[in-house]
Amino acid sequence: MDIYEHKKSFMERQIRLLNRPMRPPKDWKLPLKSGQLSESVVETVFQRLQLRIQKHAKLNYSHQATQHVAAQIRKLYEQNSAIEDITFLNPLFYGEIDLSNLDSVKSLPHPWPFQKESRPVEKDEEQEKFNRLTGELLGLLTTLSELEQERSELEQIEKMLEPFEDGPSSIHTNMWKKNPELISTLNSTNTMVAKINSLLRGVSFPSLNNDNQEASLEDEIRSQLFEKTISDD
């Protein structure tokens, strides 16, 4: 049964109740002997009231009037359930939007598509309320985003300070563990220094008063180091 038939049936039942004969209750009399109304007077009052009710029902609750009221009620129900065309909106707007996401809140439509039957004053009030709440939510989410970024930066700083947690004695050990490229570079440097020291033990250092002597010493060390490297390979 649709809304029209349901409401029409309800009103017809109420009208039939109005047409039922009215009678006073059996215990309407008070236990007082003086000032009592006679039963005939009470029955006459009820009869006249019944006639007035029936006349009122006939004038105001006719079959055509009942149909008209039921149709108006159905129209109101349809208007309450119908809103403006929002097919252009994202499906998230059908009760699934994540209000904790900054991008989702920014994508909310402005102005919001309110119901068609809303009066202009109501729409303005609702729009003002919507704008205020949206602004507050955007402010909170922006602050939250900034705090999360700050936390990420602090976590990076904390990770960089991990080698210093156990004091100076463990700094070098932690740096060696955290940076394998540094280990490889230092090993190569130590090997090169050892080779140079080994070569320098057999080289006599002449006076370094002129540039030619400095150049000849440098060439000799480079030549011996190069030959030593080839022989080792």
UniProtKB/Swiss-Prot annotation:
Q: How does it assemble?
A: Component of the inner kinetochore constitutive centromere-associated network (CCAN) (also known as central kinetochore Sim4 complex in fission yeast), which is composed of at least cnl2, cnp3, cnp20, fta1, fta2, fta3, fta4, fta6, fta7, mal2, mhf1, mhf2, mis6, mis15, mis17, sim4 and wip1.
For this record, the Gene Ontology CC terms, alphabetical, are: cytoplasm; kinetochore; microtubule; Mis6-Sim4 complex; nucleus
What gene is this protein a product of?
A: fta4
Location of the protein in the cell: Nucleus; Chromosome, Centromere, Kinetochore
Q: Which InterPro entries match?
A: Sim4_Fta4
Q: Which GO terms describe its biological process?
A: cell division; mitotic sister chromatid segregation
Give the protein's biological function: Component of the kinetochore, a multiprotein complex that assembles on centromeric DNA and attaches chromosomes to spindle microtubules, mediating chromosome segregation and sister chromatid segregation during meiosis and mitosis. Component of the inner kinetochore constitutive centromere-associated network (CCAN), which serves as a structural platform for outer kinetochore assembly. Fta2, fta3 and fta4 associate with the central core (cnt) and inner repeat (inr) region of the centromere.
Stated family: Belongs to the NKP1 family.
- Species annotation: Schizosaccharomyces pombe (strain 972 / ATCC 24843)
Modification sites for Phosphothreonine: T189, T191
- Write the record's keywords in alphabetical order, separated by commas: Cell cycle, Cell division, Centromere, Chromosome, Chromosome partition, Kinetochore, Microtubule, Mitosis, Nucleus, Phosphoprotein
Phylogenetic lineage: Eukaryota, Fungi, Dikarya, Ascomycota, Taphrinomycotina
Identification of the protein by name: Inner kinetochore subunit fta4
